[in-house]
Amino acid sequence: MTYNFSKTAQFLQTAKPLFSPFQSSSALFLAAGLSISTILPVFAGTAQKTQLISQGGKKVEITLVSYAVTKAAYEKIIPNFVAKWKKEKGQEVVIRQSYGGSGSQTRAVIDGLPADVVALALALDTKKIEQAGLINPGWEKEAPNGSIITRSVVALETRAGNPKKIKTWNDLIKPGVKIVTANPKTSGGARWNFLALWGAVTKNGGNETQALKFVNDVFRNVVVLPKDARESSDAFYKKGQGDVLLNYENEVILAAQQGKTDVSYEVPSVNISIEGPVAVVDKNVDKRGTREVSEAFVKFLFTPEAQREFAKVGFRPVNAAVAKEVQNKFPKITQLYTVGSLGGWDAVQKKFFNDGAIFDKIQGGRR
């Protein structure tokens, strides 16, 4: 079944977010400095939005660092948490936010961006912050659901009406099909795409030899391999390159909510669970004395109230009750697998993406 953008957007959200899902703002955040009084800055590209959340009295300030497409959900979630904390603790909370590409946000935190909470696109980025000594080992066990707050899957985004009839993974290797995907050596999101292609074989009755051949064949049809998700989307949308873009389902839905109607999409029924983790940055919260409110905010992200907001912008909720509420709103996945079932991020990185690993060999064969 080919999904039309406008119809998908209608059931998930009635109001359209007002930002580009690919705008990065970490540089703007750093340039703006860290001072704040009674307002909540929300940085997204050149656009800034402020929301009054503190009117004097004692207050506590924390900083959330996340990746771009989560912004629409947090705009709804944060005021609800602020109100809840005020009611229960009698304390004003100011939550500063920084949004951008997950990889660039990771580097910014390691380089000194004083995040109290990080909610990044993949656990590998969170592990890099852990390895830098800012997050304690075992962070995955500090929150429910293995500290995963959002899920998505890989979608095949095509031109309107799907003229090339690209509906399954196997359609990607047809002669004449032109594919756009970011480079998994430089893009965290593209690693999910690559693993989805690999699992399309190994999690569907095939072996690794067959998987290697299939992924090789797919990349022979890749016409452009940009460094990140933003550039791959620009290549597909703005430059008109390719017949199909490998993308996150939630990003496709978010684009629909922003009025993008000239493309369609398919969700293969064998797919990888794209998992977005959250963690408290231990070194920073202990230094600033913000652990209590930071941990409470993380806990709040798992509530039905917060999970519904994530669902509205296209994420598949991790809360069981909310997932049941919206189960008919998303295409059904018959075989859903995780990075854990592929050996975990450390093993995956070594096997596929390190220098000289499988992806480099595939690239060598394309030259």
Tell where the protein language model's regions lie, with residue ranges.
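Bacterial N-terminal signal peptides that target proteins for export
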Residues: 4-29
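Bacterial N-terminal signal peptides
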Residues: 25-41
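Early extracytoplasmic/lumenal segment of secretory-pathway proteins
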Residues: 44-132, 142-143, 248, 367
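A conserved helix-loop-strand patch within extracytoplasmic ligand-binding domains
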Residues: 50, 56, 130-203
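Extracellular/periplasmic juxtamembrane helices and adjacent flexible linkers that interface
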Residues: 55-56, 285-367
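Alpha-to-beta junction loops
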Residues: 112-118, 177, 239-244
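A bilobed periplasmic-binding-protein/Venus flytrap-type ligand-binding module shared by bacterial periplasmic
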Residues: 153-162, 275-292, 309-312
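Ligand-binding pocket segment of bilobal, Venus flytrap-like solute-binding proteins
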Residues: 204-269
